[in-house]
Amino acid sequence: MIFWLRSVIVTFGRPAEWPRCLRHLCSRGAAMDLGPMRKTYRGDPEAFEETHLTSLDPVKQFAAWFEEAVQCPDIMEANAMCLATCTRDGKPSARMVLLKGFGKDGFRFFTNFESRKGKELDSNPFASLVFYWEPLHRQVRVEGPVKKLPEEEAECYFHSRPKSSQIGAVVSHQSSVIPDREYLRKKNKELEQLYQEQEVPKPKYWGGYILYPQVMEFWQGQTNRLHDRIVFRRGLLTGDSPLGPMTHRGEEDWVYERLAP
């Protein structure tokens, strides 16, 4: 940890190792200046140029980067993503979830329909996904409309999960207020006994969504903060539509551009 005190930078380790006066300041809500916290990213020779695109189809480009993330030993969950949703009156919320499949038709994830994200997607069926692979200094952002997956697909995936996860989905009415953790333990134990010798039925309030990508942005970090940003968006379907001088035609109905960092 770095703490600014009268223009002197003082560096500390874990909170338990901080001086008592600093722990007191933090507990009192003192402002923390995190300005000096920064990491070295890539150098200019490793810049992400347009010629480095694996494909002019952004879903295929995502697949290439995703595979690199999967193969990277320092990335524990390459399919972890931040899912951002929003109420109809503009109040956003975000949380980490797991990507469970992707292809030309979209990006799949599963959750509880009665959760906050489920309710927000019901009233405002648009979302944004962000994948951040820190060891590779890469980020991918995906935006688009969201719809529920067919019940058969949700049923199939639900029963492919470990039985403990299936029971967990039945136990937890996600985002509802509960008295304590013991409440979950007790209910979980009851259902483990109930379904010991039988299949766990998928709750009606649990299922999947698919986000159809309309915008996909690929970001790669540079140490000098002149980061690389190449964004794909769905353009006009007519092949003879004129493009701007800095807009390039991708595959099918995609166009792409470089954005200032």
From Swiss-Prot:
Ligase keyword on record: no
Known pathway: Cofactor metabolism; pyridoxal 5'-phosphate salvage; pyridoxal 5'-phosphate from pyridoxamine 5'-phosphate: step 1/1; Cofactor metabolism; pyridoxal 5'-phosphate salvage; pyridoxal 5'-phosphate from pyridoxine 5'-phosphate: step 1/1
Residues at which FMN binds: 95-98, 110-111, 116-117, 139, 174-175, 219, 229
Keywords from the named record: Flavoprotein, FMN, Oxidoreductase, Phosphoprotein, Pyridoxal phosphate, Pyridoxine biosynthesis
Pfam families attached to this UniProt entry: PNP_phzG_C, PNPOx_N
Substrates-to-products reaction catalysed: pyridoxamine 5'-phosphate + O2 + H2O = pyridoxal 5'-phosphate + H2O2 + NH4(+); pyridoxine 5'-phosphate + O2 = pyridoxal 5'-phosphate + H2O2
A cellular component annotation (GO) from this entry: cytosol
Cofactor binding note from Swiss-Prot or TrEMBL: Binds 1 FMN per subunit.
A Gene Ontology molecular function term of the record: pyridoxamine phosphate oxidase activity
EC number per UniProt: 1.4.3.5
PROSITE patterns: PYRIDOX_OXIDASE (PS01064)
Modified residue annotations for Phosphothreonine: 238
Record's signal peptide: none
Quaternary structure note: Homodimer.
Its biological purpose: Catalyzes the oxidation of either pyridoxine 5'-phosphate (PNP) or pyridoxamine 5'-phosphate (PMP) into pyridoxal 5'-phosphate (PLP).
Entry's family note: Belongs to the pyridoxamine 5'-phosphate oxidase family.
This protein's name: Pyridoxine-5'-phosphate oxidase
Taxonomic source organism: Bos taurus
